[in-house]
Amino acid sequence: MIASRKLFDDSEAAHPITEEEFIKVENIRGKLFLVGAEDDALWDTAKYIRRMEKRLAEQPHTCAVEAVIYEHGTHFVFPDGMLRTMLPVGSALFVKLAFSAAKKYPRECKTARIDIDRRMTRVICDWRDKK
């Protein structure tokens, strides 16, 4: 998989994001569940999550926010069950072939996906139970 993270970083360095271009996350109503990994090779997910958290800390909002950033998890920070549903055969092999961090840190990436599965299930069940 081609790493595009540098492309995103270079693009933002050449044209810093203006206020008008920011996504107004403070206007989101409901639960905002942000998940990313430091070793995302496609874009700097952790930076963007931190940026959204900072914006929410500075702006009035009514959304409930849960943000989780894993050291290892690659760009595929899917819940483990979802990944196995999408790729019932060979999901672990695919992730290892697509992302070098998954090959280097397979246990950590798997642990992150299992934790994401647990957290997302809890968020969805909490939402369902409030209805």
Give the positions of each predicted feature.
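Alpha/beta-hydrolase-fold catalytic nucleophile elbow
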Residues: S11, V35, Y70-E71
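Short alpha-helix in the alpha/beta-hydrolase fold that links the catalytic acid
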Residues: G30, D44-E58, M82-L83
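Acidic catalytic loop of the alpha/beta-hydrolase fold
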Residues: E38-W43, T74-V77
